[in-house]
């Protein structure tokens, strides 16, 4: 039993946890972009047509999720349910390898949904190879799922999943729903699956990745976490910001929520828009919905101005990739989650009461709007406590004094996203590539005036190394300095600096 008692030193306390349990690993950069996910019986043509539409709308995606209908689901009842499956439905996807290769060509990583509980049954293409691997005759009897059986688990990864990965699957959405029970007391199948899938992924890719439910303390070592299923209600949205920030207290920083909600609830374009705005400023941005014809989260399904707001925010998520990936390294190296409660920085009593807001990396404070619009003014509001100093909204350019609370009203085009005085927000330049895997030779950096500041922009290079560019603002001298590494491998040829919080906005261009 460990007891961590750090008083108000929340950061130090979590670092103590990491000292004995290991830190959060680095995510692949593509995981930080926009994910498309829907529980829907797609076929290949419909899925690729949908990807065409996202591209035509200028909405960048980096992960393509294919829910459980990729595999056979309408099976002989004598085998059990169609919930578990490992054989592609070739009526829907005639050539799985070509389908996934086309998604890869478009810059998308691919993840497939699996429910492992019913094991491997005789109708599966992998049944006989699994039997051979386990030294048993293919009698038609099911191969039981058993996390306590080392031989089964070796074949589970080395035969069952490896065969599918050879067709192009990058990582797995492990949708375990069958409880914490196994043949060995205390051995939770979810924990074994999370560790196993992450470690197996890390052996195949430069950085591991799985996508599964939280299995208890220590789960931060096996990102990403799946929090679904979310109800489509304001109450459900209102719960997610404080739930996400609180995850930092146990080092669990990489939550993926059902952005927009999954099921039940009601249709509300304002709710959907506010949810996407929160999703863009959450650890993982994964649009998701059920198979209902009325619940899809394609932005063009919604009325204006919500549609325009969703598209602009999803573009902003992609533009934030340089910042997000720097915070990815920050989380791994320095023991900080991307989303943290404001009381990590400000220990005043108010910081412990305003739980709908949070720190988003080292530079931003975000206050999602989680209530309906006031019908009189057609705006929603967030009650925000600001730590000391000055804070500037990156959309409106308005500055606020810290050390006090504010009620901030916004129309449907934005939520309060505040950059600390002396803060820096690096963004992909407008018009740059929509591919999250690529390097970005042009950056725009938002800089908030009002205080001295320093930001270390950690970036990956073409040879998969990290380099650091230091940005410094001297408010007293009116000087902004960019110190590039001695051997700059970023390929960057242009910077655009946009100053916020001045009497009038101004920009400077550096070649």
What role is predicted for each listed range?
Residues 414-510:
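Accessory, solvent-exposed terminal regions and/or long lumenal/extracellular loops of proteins
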